[in-house]
Design a protein with these regions (language model features):
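Acceptor-substrate binding/catalytic loop of class I
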Residues: 171-188
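Conserved SAM-binding loop and adjacent beta-strand
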Residues: 22-41
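Substrate-binding/catalytic lobe of Class I Rossmann-like enzymes that use SAM or dcSAM, i.e.
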Residues: 190-196
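Conserved SAM-binding loop
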Residues: 38-45, 50-159, 186, 227-229
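N-terminal, positively charged/glycine-rich alpha-helical extensions of SAM-dependent methyltransferases
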Residues: 1-21
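Conserved S-adenosyl-L-methionine
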Residues: 198-209
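Short, flexible, mixed-charge acidic loops at enzyme active sites
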Residues: 158-168
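Core SAM-dependent methyltransferase catalytic element
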Residues: 214-234
């Protein structure tokens, strides 16, 4: 089986697993941007009866939001405790979602199932090999399928905003959540998508205000951004 995980990253999120669904806890920013992310995806693809896979699903925030758009949702993550939280929360809320403790690369190696939509949001900056992850996501897509990615740009502004501001000044993220060297420029992520056989359709910036705790999509790719691409039909 192919491994593309940073053990320290997995342990970091495993330790926080019990707090995934606390809207005022360490994952508060994700709770705030989650509806925005789900609506962005659902506005580009009609999810009704679509087979959707969320890679790096954590405690299941995005999976449950996409379930509400009538998709057939699966989630995978390498941090086992988070998967258990996701399973429990989905069951408690009567949402039929399939969760597995496995990486995208391992899933490619272990089964032939393909998906109409693959999402991988706020995950790429936590793995050693971004290209391997994007390629695995592409390999899990059906021909004509849609891929949604999001991450953080790498520049002085993103260091000030996403690390200094978010982790040390406003304390909206636990210290050590991000490593600047793992941030990815949009041009680099677009190159990863092309190498993986994905045609880039759209890129949007995402702004989170740490004072008002409001978020919106825009055309500023300076810090957080999303990419949407399609796999050719043949």
């Amino acid at each position: 089986m192919t491994q593309n995980i940073d053990t320290s990253e997995v342990e970091k999120f495993a330790d926080l697993a019990e707090r995934w669904w606390d809207p005022k806890g360490e994952f508060k920013p994700l709770h705030i941007i989650n509806p925005l992310r789900a609506e962005f995806i659902a506005s580009r693809v009609d999810l009704k009866n679509m087979d959707v896979l969320d890679v790096g699903c954590g405690g299941g925030l995005l999976c449950e939001a996409l379930f509400d758009f009538n998709g057939k949702i699966s989630g995978i993550d390498a941090a086992g405790p988070g998967i258990e939280i996701a399973k429990r929360h989905a069951k408690d809320n009567c949402k039929e979602i399939l969760y597995r403790d496995i990486t995208a690369e391992e899933l490619v190696d272990s089964e032939s199932e393909k998906y109409d939509v693959v999402t991988c949001l706020e995950v790429i900056e936590h793995v050693p090999d971004p290209q391997s992850l994007v390629t695995a996501c592409s390999n899990l897509l059906k021909p004509g399928g849609s891929l949604f990615l999001s991450t953080i740009n790498r520049n002085p502004r993103s260091w000030i905003t996403a690390i200094v501001g978010a982790e040390y000044i406003f304390n909206i993220l636990p210290k050590g959540t991000h490593e600047f060297s793992k941030f990815i420029k949009p041009s680099e992520l677009a190159s990863c998508m092309r190498t993986a056989g994905i045609n880039l359709s759209e890129t949007k910036g995402m702004f989170y205000n740490p004072l008002t705790h409001k978020a919106n999509l825009n055309n500023d790719l300076g810090v957080n951004y999303l990419m949407y691409g399609k796999k050719p039909k043949n």
